[in-house]
């Protein structure tokens, strides 16, 4: 299996307790929208029983020159190390894996259901399909507790506003604990939505 070295360009908070890590895409690294890959820390300052490798969905689409990985920041050695890594830090990435992708028949709509951080493969799939003008009608349902927890909510709303083929339906299940005004859907994803 081929492994590549990748360099951290920047890290940013994209929702409450959620960070995105942007890496320069290595030469020759090719993937399909919706795939994932193993990221391995190189000589981390600490480790735990879970080890130094994690599998992440690739949140960026293939047409971009960067690889973006998004995660909820939990208290593990891996995430503490990643969360404090400086620009220029190097990690290893394995070959892309998985066959989670948009079907090829544009006559059939693509309907995607995501919860929380599970939005990451759909970020790649939807942005690639919109850029390619795939012709698919796309319906992306995304459930979160609160808008504060919804990674890339604003970006997906903007993409949907620009592309008539994409309908983005975010819904919030815990607005009683939110400090933000929300006028969209509430409750779990249902057939009626």
Give the role of each language-model region:
Residues 2-89, 144-146, 171-174:
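Ferredoxin-reductase
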Residues 74-193:
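FNR/FR-type flavoprotein reductase catalytic core
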């Amino acid at each position: 299996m081929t492994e590549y070295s990748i360099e951290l360009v920047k890290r940013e908070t994209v929702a409450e307790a959620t960070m995105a890590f942007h890496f320069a895409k290595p030469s020759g690294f090719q993937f399909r929208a919706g795939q994932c890959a193993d990221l391995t820390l190189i000589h981390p300052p600490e480790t735990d029983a879970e080890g130094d490798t994690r599998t992440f969905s690739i949140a960026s689409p293939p047409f971009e020159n960067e690889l973006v990985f998004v995660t909820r920041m939990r208290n593990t050695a891996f995430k503490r190390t990643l969360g404090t890594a400086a620009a220029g830090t190097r990690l290893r990435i394995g070959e892309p894996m998985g066959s989670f992708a948009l079907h090829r028949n544009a006559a059939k709509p693509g309907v995607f259901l995501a919860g929380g951080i599970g939005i990451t493969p759909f970020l790649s799939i939807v942005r690639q399909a919109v850029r390619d003008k795939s012709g698919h009608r796309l319906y992306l349902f995304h459930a979160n507790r609160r808008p504060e927890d919804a990674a890339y909510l604003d970006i997906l709303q903007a993409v949907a506003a620009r592309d008539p083929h994409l309908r983005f339906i975010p819904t919030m299940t815990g607005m009683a604990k939110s400090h933000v005004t929300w006028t969209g859907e509430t409750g779990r994803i249902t057939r009626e939505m």
